[in-house]
């Protein structure tokens, strides 16, 4: 389909119009839409074509000039989860239901249950014809969605590069999460950014951004130095105690809990939690990963029980 897509030479005199399109409209002009996605996006695969036909809760936005498709956004509706027990299970790492990629990630990693409760739209794909890139089409598409989408916040997950981070920042998004591992598809760390729209969405963006900025200096993430701050916050807050509890007694990941663990150990005797302190030095989980994690969780759990007495 990429070969069938007809590219349009850049012409600054042409007027670009942005509209929302239904799934039926996209499918009726499939060669054009999917051709653009394949031309401009490394992640687009035949599986995406199947999703176009089968998946529900999709939204599409097109930037056109004289019936030529110059740019497009493919977005997915997320959030609106009303089951509080399910949300708590997601936060603890006990459940990972299908879908809701960003709400689940923020609920689990940043402990923000509101991310699951609020309604959001995730930008799954954004593509602009190569000859029309760097001319504001992508920014205009995002601004149109911001003004017209009836949701609490927008989100995007992307392979982190300085250039992409700057683009999303220019569009009004705040970086709120960095994945632990390099993605096979991009060779980059996955990143999540948010843009609040409603009052609750704006508050969620603020909380998520502040939490990210507060915790990244105390993580062992390879990109932590990119986000260096003047001072490191060592104070144990309620969110840290929740992080410690969910690591010790449930399935919170070590990487997500690490800033809280480092704050916790800062207030303890140097002889406390020797396995965890060894991990701080070696960056290696003791023994094999499964049993080593159990030991680290147990060490923190025992200390939490003593501190609670």
Predicted feature descriptions by range:
Residues 54-76, 81-83:
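Conserved beta-hairpin
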């Amino acid at each position: 389909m990429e070969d069938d897509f007809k590219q349009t030479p850049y012409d600054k005199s042409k007027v670009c119009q942005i509209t929302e399109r239904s799934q039926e409209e996209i499918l009726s002009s499939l060669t054009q839409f999917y051709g653009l996605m394949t031309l401009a996006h490394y992640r687009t695969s035949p599986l995406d074509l199947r999703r176009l036909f089968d998946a529900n809760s999709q939204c599409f936005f097109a930037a056109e000039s004289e019936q030529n498709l110059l740019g497009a956004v493919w977005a997915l509706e997320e959030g609106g989860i009303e089951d509080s027990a399910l949300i708590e299970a997601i936060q603890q790492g006990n459940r990972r239901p299908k879908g809701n990629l960003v709400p689940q990630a923020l609920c689990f990693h940043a402990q923000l249950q509101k991310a699951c409760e609020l309604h959001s739209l995730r930008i799954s794909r954004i593509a602009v014809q190569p000859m029309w890139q760097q001319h504001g089409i992508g920014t205009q598409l995002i601004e149109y969605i911001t003004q017209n989408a009836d949701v609490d916040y927008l989100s995007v997950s992307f392979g982190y590069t300085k250039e992409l981070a700057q683009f999303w920042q220019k569009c009004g998004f705040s970086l709120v999460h960095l994945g632990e591992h390099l993605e096979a598809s991009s060779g980059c760390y996955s990143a999540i950014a948010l843009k609040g729209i409603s009052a609750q969405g704006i508050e969620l963006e603020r909380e998520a951004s502040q939490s990210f900025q507060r915790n990244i200096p105390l993580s062992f993430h390879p990109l932590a130095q990119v986000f260096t701050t003047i001072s490191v916050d060592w104070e144990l807050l309620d969110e840290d105690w929740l992080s410690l509890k969910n690591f010790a007694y449930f399935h919170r990941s070590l990487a997500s809990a690490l800033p809280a663990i480092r704050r916790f150990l800062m207030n303890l005797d140097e002889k406390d939690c020797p396995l965890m302190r060894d991990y701080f030095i070696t960056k290696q989980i003791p023994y094999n990963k499964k049993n080593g994690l159990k030991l680290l969780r147990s060490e923190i759990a025992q200390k939490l029980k003593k501190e609670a007495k």
